[in-house]
């Protein structure tokens, strides 16, 4: 990629989906089948140890632990193919079954659909109310009884865990940092590549010969270190990734269960433009397969399925990474296609279902539609009944009863839905109730752009939801009008340009929405402004986070498992980002398609993500780590190589105050809402607020890297904590008293007016028509319980170890690292510095810090590795939601809700004590973003980089002069690995020996051997090490001797130098240098011209291909104005401000 100003902001825009829906295979005449219901794309139970041919399976098959339909009902919220929405409008998603050939040795005879099913009688006298009562009381077994013609009950599959794997618990029993005793001598061979090749299935791979090291005496038992070239060859994507497996279509399969292979429908720029291909790179193969990792199925659903998103990573022919982001939008099938599909479904029902089953399913659908109509009439009566009256209470009880009945009946219908018609009158939205997914995506080569691409895609796809995203201001000439998708695509891929360093930022507009693309400064951790790490910390406990980090450091084969594809993307990128300054150099596939699951047998380290809904997941025989993001568990075949004891305890302690969301703020475990779907709670929220602010937030890495441990947990100033952006369109609404956009000649240092300001008088006008079909009263049915009651689910409470009793449940500044009694640091704890002042000087603090290998700065009683979590309780005036502590404020009538932007109702409103966000009682259930006081991403990154800086503290001392041969090979330095390891304390030498066998550490050393120390990426980490040295006591700068270790670990700084910067200490200023943190705004022309045709039909369509007639000639190309176009009219297009003449050095 060219790094000049002509680099596009995105390389390609593409569309993928189903080209045609055709069932060309003839229907079988009458084959015997064992039909079993598998709702919402979930796996069909198989007999334990029996494959399709009836023979014993020679391998351990990965199987899901869900045993029946009842268990499946509770584990499928927010997924693509399950539509149990928050609002209580339960929906069925797909009528699908798995058809497998019946065998004589099976456990039961199949039902050919000619007789009554076992366990169910005729519909005569069937009582639905009794069935509902039985279903509510015996839900675990009731759905099993409804498996009518499936024959005898099959055995449930065991959990998807290899028998050799064990649950990893981060206990403090092995704190020496040595190898776990579970690893015997034969399995303790180091070397990531050879260790991965030693599992039993690699018969075709020959082990490397074991030769002693010439420079290491007595090293005959240690295998020779693999060369970088050999490691790269084994880690090559194309060498270990097999070709995709073909689709296996069963002629007896239900039409809605059949999978279709996704295809590329269109792309921009098109493939017939060779000059663009040469500049942007070759469009990779298999993009549709990564967009639909589990292929495509037609979905039967009452409402439009929820839109989801995910990112993926591919490797090109030259071994470079290509990153993609995609959003899935569901489009209704046309009437003719739906009619043909319904005919085939009816033929299947006639062949494979009994009359009783079909009648029961149809009757249940009719009954459900009647109950939904009854609910609508009750809700219509609600505004006319006075609040607080007995009639209102009775009406509320009646509504609750009907809602519960609808919920139960919908769950009953889900496993039987294949027996009913796809469309139920009064219940199904759209023409047919059949939906097909379509993927819109972006490709590029900059991983830091993925968050920007995602939010840009969400913005341009809002009109396609046809009102499904709530609280979007209506289009108008003043606010802005939607443009065709084609013009937005040209604007991103051709007219927009990549920012040049940290001196510029690119502003891209979508209607009134302004998005800002920035590049990290050279003295910042790459990706620290754009890569999300909160989602990973929400899914896993701190113990599991540290264990996962240890597995990644030793280059294990890590497999992430989740029901949400977006969560896989977030977790993989977060883990790699936390390894800085090390770079993951092996296989990296955040979303592994189902047809590439055999890649799990790759004989090298990898980080891959696997969806839980895949039908067959075969785990490796040995040497893997399975991380379940939905259940917060880690299963592995061996314990991780633990960090040295003091480093591990110090890292864990810093994470407790940097990521207190679960410990102190009651955040539930699991993927966040924005990882589950594109528009959580039908709102356009912004999990990355910096993308919508023209003023870049100041970097705090220098502060937390150099901050003393005793002050690491101090809260951010109230002026720096802003409420989350729950509606980006309201956040970017046009102010009539402000220019249309900030100028490009200088930086704009003022943020746009907040739409949630309690003193703001600029409120958007109420639309003349509802924003969407379900927006009346902002989804009244979804928030009815919140309006009638203030009872919410209990969440965990912050730990009393952080002084809860002293400071109360508010987000107030609290002293970090307190013990159970909540006392402040004192001189009695010798390892805690007296200096607890906040970071106010330009230096890195003058408080006490240990020397290189001293004991931890935290006393053992304050580490709290197994801290107990106390629950937080909701009261009449306090509600905890996503880390927000909402307190009821009486009389705050001038405040506006941060979620819906309406004024306070009644006599008050809820206000978060941490970020000052406001919310109505009915809007508390729609709070999808965490409070900024509950999670500090900069401090989390600082904790990990401090840990690695401590491990590699003296590495530069062992970079010496290269030999003549090394110099001829391009090396500027020669690293003495043996000398580096011998200089470490004894308890760290074994961990360093492990690191020397990893590819990431070898790449780390190789980069420093071949590049000067002034290189930006190298100098940054060296300055982090210097900041660690600056935290030490004055006069003990190096701190490498054993005597200095003893002195620093037992002597507290009690002189005046502890309270002021030491005069003799040279303060590194590189980390705190903000001279290049300018981010001047350069605006890209916003598409705003008129276009022919019906406005609504054009902007709301879900196109399968881009319409070139709706495109316009680019006004600029990557910021460069086009040459003057002198046609017959002799008009010259007006040039817009661009980046001409601007360079990072200016």
Swiss-Prot record:
Which coarse location class describes where this protein primarily resides? secreted
- What segments bear the compositional bias annotation Low complexity? 744-760
User: Which stretches of sequence are listed as region Disordered?
Assistant: 25-75, 156-226, 730-806, 1121-1146
Biased composition, class Polar residues, residue ranges: 769-783
Q: CDD domains in the record, alphabetically?
A: C1
Write one Pfam family the protein is assigned to: dDENN
Domain of life, per the record? Eukaryota
Q: Where in the cell is it found?
A: Secreted; Host cell
Zinc finger extent (Phorbol-ester/DAG-type): 883-931
Domain cDENN: residue ranges: 522-656
Q: Which GO terms describe its cellular component?
A: cytoplasmic vesicle; extracellular region; host cell
A GO MF term: metal ion binding
Its keywords, alphabetically, are:
Metal-binding, Secreted, Virulence, Zinc, Zinc-finger
Hey, what's the signal peptide range on this chain? Answer: none
Explain the consequences of disrupting this gene. Enhances V.dahliae virulence in plants.
Similarity field? Belongs to the EPD1 elicitor family.
What binding partners and quaternary form does the record give?
Interacts with host cotton EIR5A (AC A0A5J5T2N2) and EIR5D (AC A0A5J5NT52) and host N.benthamiana EIR (AC P0DXJ0).
Protein name, entry field = Elicitor of plant defense protein 1
Query: Which gene is the coding source of this polypeptide chain?
Result: EPD1
């Amino acid at each position: 990629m060219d790094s000049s100003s002509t680099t596009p902001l995105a390389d390609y825009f593409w569309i993928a989906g189903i080209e045609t829906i055709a069932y060309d295979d003839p229907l079988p005449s009458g084959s015997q089948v064992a039909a079993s219901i598998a709702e919402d794309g979930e796996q069909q139970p198989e007999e334990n140890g029996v494959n399709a041919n009836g023979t014993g399976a020679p391998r351990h098959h990965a199987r899901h632990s869900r045993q029946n339909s009842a268990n499946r009902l509770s584990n499928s919220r927010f997924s693509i193919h399950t539509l149990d929405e928050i609002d209580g409008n339960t929906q069925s998603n797909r009528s699908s079954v798995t058809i497998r050939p019946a065998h004589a040795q099976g456990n039961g005879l199949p039902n050919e659909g000619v007789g009554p099913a076992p366990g169910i009688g005729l519909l005569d006298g069937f009582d639905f109310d009794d069935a509902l009562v039985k279903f509510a009381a015996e839900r675990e077994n009731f759905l099993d009884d409804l498996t009518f013609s499936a024959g005898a009950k099959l055995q449930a599959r065991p959990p998807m865990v290899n028998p050799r794997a064990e649950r990893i618990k981060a206990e403090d029993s092995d704190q020496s940092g040595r190898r776990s005793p579970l690893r015997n001598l034969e399995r303790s061979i180091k070397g990531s590549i050879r260790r991965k090749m030693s599992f039993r299935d690699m018969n075709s791979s020959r082990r490397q010969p074991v030769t002693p090291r010439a420079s290491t005496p007595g090293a005959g038992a240690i295998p020779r270190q693999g060369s970088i070239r050999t490691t790269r060859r084994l880690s090559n994507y194309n060498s270990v990734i097999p070709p995709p497996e073909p689709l296996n279509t069963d002629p007896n399969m239900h039409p809605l269960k059949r999978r279709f292979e996704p295809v590329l429908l269109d792309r921009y720029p098109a493939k017939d433009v060779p000059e663009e291909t040469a500049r942007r790179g070759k469009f990779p193969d298999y993009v549709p397969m990564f967009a639909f990792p589990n292929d495509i199925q037609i979905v039967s659903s009452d409402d439009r399925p929820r839109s989801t998103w995910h990112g993926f990573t591919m490797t090109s022919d030259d071994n470079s990474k290509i990153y993609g982001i995609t959003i899935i939008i569901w489009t209704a099938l046309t009437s003719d296609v739906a009619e043909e599909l319904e005919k085939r479904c009816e033929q299947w029902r006639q062949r494979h279902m009994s009359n009783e089953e079909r009648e029961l399913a149809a009757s249940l659908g009719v009954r459900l539609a009647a109950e939904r109509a009854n609910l609508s009439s009750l809700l219509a009566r609600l505004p006319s009944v006075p609040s607080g009256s007995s009639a209102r209470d009775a009406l509320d009880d009646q509504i609750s009863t009907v809602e519960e009945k609808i919920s139960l009946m919908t769950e009953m219908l889900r496993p039987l839905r294949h027996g009913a018609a796809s469309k139920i009158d009064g219940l199904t939205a759209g023409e047919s109730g059949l939906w097909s997914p379509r993927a819109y995506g972006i490709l590029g080569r900059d991983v830091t752009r993925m968050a920007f691409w995602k939010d840009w895609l969400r913005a341009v796809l809002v009109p396609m939801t046809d009102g499904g995203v709530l609280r979007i201001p209506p289009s108008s000439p003043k606010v802005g009008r939607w443009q065709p998708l084609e013009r937005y695509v040209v604007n991103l891929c051709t007219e927009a340009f990549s920012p040049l360093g940290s001196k510029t930022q690119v502003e891209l507009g979508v209607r009134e929405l302004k998005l800002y693309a920035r590049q990290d400064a050279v003295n910042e951790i790459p990706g620290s402004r754009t890569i999300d790490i909160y989602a990973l910390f929400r899914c896993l406990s701190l113990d599991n986070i540290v264990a996962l980090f240890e597995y990644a450091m030793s280059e294990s084969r890590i497999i992430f498992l989740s029901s949400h594809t977006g969560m896989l993307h977030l977790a993989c990128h977060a883990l790699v980002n936390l390894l800085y300054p090390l770079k993951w150099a092996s296989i990296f596939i955040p979303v592994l398609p189902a047809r590439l699951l055999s890649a799990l047998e790759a004989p090298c380290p990898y980080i891959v993500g696997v969806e839980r809904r895949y039908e067959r997941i075969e785990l490796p025989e040995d040497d893997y780590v399975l991380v379940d993001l939905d259940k917060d568990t880690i299963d592995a075949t061996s314990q991780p190589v633990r960090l040295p004891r003091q480093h591990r305890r110090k890292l864990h302690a810093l994470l407790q105050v940097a990521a207190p969301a679960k410990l102190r703020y009651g955040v539930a475990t699991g993927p966040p809402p924005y990882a589950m779907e594109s528009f959580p709670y039908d709102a356009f929220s912004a999990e990355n607020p910096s993308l919508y602010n023209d003023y870049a937030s100041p970097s705090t890495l220098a502060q937390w890297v150099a901050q003393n441990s005793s002050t690491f947990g101090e809260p951010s100033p109230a002026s720096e904590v802003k409420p989350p952006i729950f509606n980006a369109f309201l956040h970017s609404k046009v102010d009539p008293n402000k220019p249309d956009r900030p100028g490009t000649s200088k930086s704009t240092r003022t943020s746009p007016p907040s739409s949630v300001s309690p003193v703001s008088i600029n409120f958007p006008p109420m639309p003349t028509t509802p924003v969407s079909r379900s927006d009346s009263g902002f989804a009244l049915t979804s928030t009815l319980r919140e309006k009638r009651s203030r009872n919410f689910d209990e969440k965990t409470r912050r730990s009393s170890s952080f002084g809860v009793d002293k400071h109360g449940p508010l987000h107030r500044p609290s002293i970090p690292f307190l013990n159970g009694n909540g006392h402040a640091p004192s001189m009695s704890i010798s390892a805690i510095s007296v200096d607890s002042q906040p970071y106010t000087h330009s230096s890195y603090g003058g408080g006490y810090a240990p020397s290189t290998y001293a004991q931890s700065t935290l006393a053992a009683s304050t580490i709290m590795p197994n801290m107990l979590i106390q629950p937080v309780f909701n009261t009449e005036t306090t509600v905890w939601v996503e880390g927000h502590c909402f307190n009821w404020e009486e009389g705050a009538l001038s405040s506006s809700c941060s979620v819906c932007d309406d004024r306070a109702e009644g006599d008050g409103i809820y206000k978060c004590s941490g970020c000052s966000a406001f919310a109505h009682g009915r809007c508390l259930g729609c709070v999808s973003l965490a409070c900024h006081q509950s999670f500090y991403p900069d401090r989390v990154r600082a904790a990990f980089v401090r840990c690695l800086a401590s491990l590699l503290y003296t590495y530069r001392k062992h970079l010496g002069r290269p030999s003549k041969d090394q110099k001829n090979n391009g090396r500027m330095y020669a690293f003495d690995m043996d000398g580096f390891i011998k200089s470490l304390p004894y308890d760290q030498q074994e961990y360093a020996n492990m690191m020397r066998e990893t590819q990431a550490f070898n790449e780390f050393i190789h980069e420093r051997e071949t590049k000067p120390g002034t290189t930006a990426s190298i100098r940054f980490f060296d300055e982090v090490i210097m900041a660690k040295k600056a935290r030490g006591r004055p006069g003990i700068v190096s701190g490498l001797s054993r005597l200095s270790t003893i002195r620093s670990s037992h002597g507290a700084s009690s002189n005046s130098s502890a309270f002021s910067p030491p005069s003799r200490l040279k303060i590194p200023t590189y980390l705190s240098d903000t001279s290049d943190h300018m981010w001047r705004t350069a605006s890209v022309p916003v598409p705003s011209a008129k276009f022919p045709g019906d406005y609504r039909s054009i902007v709301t369509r879900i196109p399968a291909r881009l319409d070139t007639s709706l495109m316009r000639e680019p006004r600029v190309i990557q910021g460069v104005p086009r040459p003057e176009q002198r046609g017959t009219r002799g008009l010259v297009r007006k040039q817009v401000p661009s980046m001409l003449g601007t360079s990072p050095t200016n």
